[in-house]
Design a protein with these regions (language model features):
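Bacterial N-terminal signal peptides that target proteins for export
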Residues: 4-29
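Bacterial N-terminal signal peptides
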Residues: 25-41
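A conserved helix-loop-strand patch within extracytoplasmic ligand-binding domains
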Residues: 50, 56, 130-203
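Extracellular/periplasmic juxtamembrane helices and adjacent flexible linkers that interface
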Residues: 55-56, 285-367
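Alpha-to-beta junction loops
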Residues: 112-118, 177, 239-244
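A bilobed periplasmic-binding-protein/Venus flytrap-type ligand-binding module shared by bacterial periplasmic
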Residues: 153-162, 275-292, 309-312
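Ligand-binding pocket segment of bilobal, Venus flytrap-like solute-binding proteins
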Residues: 204-269
């Protein structure tokens, strides 16, 4: 079944977010400095939005660092948490936010961006912050659901009406099909795409030899391999390159909510669970004395109230009750697998993406 953008957007959200899902703002955040009084800055590209959340009295300030497409959900979630904390603790909370590409946000935190909470696109980025000594080992066990707050899957985004009839993974290797995907050596999101292609074989009755051949064949049809998700989307949308873009389902839905109607999409029924983790940055919260409110905010992200907001912008909720509420709103996945079932991020990185690993060999064969 080919999904039309406008119809998908209608059931998930009635109001359209007002930002580009690919705008990065970490540089703007750093340039703006860290001072704040009674307002909540929300940085997204050149656009800034402020929301009054503190009117004097004692207050506590924390900083959330996340990746771009989560912004629409947090705009709804944060005021609800602020109100809840005020009611229960009698304390004003100011939550500063920084949004951008997950990889660039990771580097910014390691380089000194004083995040109290990080909610990044993949656990590998969170592990890099852990390895830098800012997050304690075992962070995955500090929150429910293995500290995963959002899920998505890989979608095949095509031109309107799907003229090339690209509906399954196997359609990607047809002669004449032109594919756009970011480079998994430089893009965290593209690693999910690559693993989805690999699992399309190994999690569907095939072996690794067959998987290697299939992924090789797919990349022979890749016409452009940009460094990140933003550039791959620009290549597909703005430059008109390719017949199909490998993308996150939630990003496709978010684009629909922003009025993008000239493309369609398919969700293969064998797919990888794209998992977005959250963690408290231990070194920073202990230094600033913000652990209590930071941990409470993380806990709040798992509530039905917060999970519904994530669902509205296209994420598949991790809360069981909310997932049941919206189960008919998303295409059904018959075989859903995780990075854990592929050996975990450390093993995956070594096997596929390190220098000289499988992806480099595939690239060598394309030259």
């Amino acid at each position: 079944m080919t999904y039309n953008f406008s119809k998908t957007a209608q059931f998930l959200q009635t109001a359209k977010p007002l930002f580009s899902p690919f705008q990065s703002s970490s540089a703007l955040f750093l340039a703006a400095g860290l001072s704040i009084s009674t307002i909540l800055p929300v940085f997204a590209g050149t656009a800034q939005k402020t929301q009054l959340i503190s009117q004097g009295g004692k207050k506590v300030e924390i900083t959330l660092v996340s990746y771009a497409v989560t912004k629409a959900a947090y705009e709804k979630i944060i005021p609800n948490f602020v109100a809840k904390w005020k009611k229960e603790k009698g304390q004003e909370v100011v939550i500063r936010q920084s949004y951008g590409g997950s990889g660039s946000q990771t580097r910014a935190v390691i380089d000194g961006l004083p995040a109290d909470v990080v909610a990044l696109a993949l656990a590998l980025d969170t592990k890099k912050i852990e390895q830098a000594g800012l997050i304690n080992p075992g962070w995955e066990k500090e929150a429910p659901n293995g500290s995963i707050i959002t899920r998505s899957v890989v979608a095949l985004e095509t031109r309107a009406g799907n003229p090339k009839k690209i509906k399954t993974w196997n359609d990607l290797i047809k002669p004449g099909v032109k594919i756009v995907t970011a480079n998994p050596k430089t893009s965290g999101g593209a690693r999910w795409n690559f693993l989805a292609l690999w699992g399309a074989v190994t999690k569907n009755g095939g072996n690794e030899t067959q998987a290697l051949k299939f992924v090789n064949d797919v990349f022979r049809n890749v016409v452009v391999l940009p460094k990140d998700a933003r550039e791959s989307s620009d290549a597909f949308y703005k430059k008109g390159q390719g017949d199909v873009l490998l993308n996150y389902e939630n990003e496709v839905i978010l684009a629909a909510q922003q009025g993008k109607t000239d493309v369609s999409y398919e969700v293969p029924s064998v797919n990888i669970s794209i998992e977005g983790p959250v963690a408290v940055v231990d070194k920073n919260v202990d230094k600033r004395g913000t652990r209590e409110v930071s941990e409470a905010f993380v806990k709040f992200l798992f509530t039905p109230e917060a999970q519904r907001e994530f669902a509205k912008v296209g994420f598949r909720p991790v809360n069981a009750a909310v997932a049941k509420e919206v189960q008919n709103k998303f295409p059904k996945i018959t075989q859903l697998y995780t990075v854990g079932s592929l050996g975990g991020w450390d093993a995956v990185q070594k096997k596929f993406f390190n220098d000289g690993a499988i992806f480099d060999k595939i690239q060598g064969g394309r030259r």
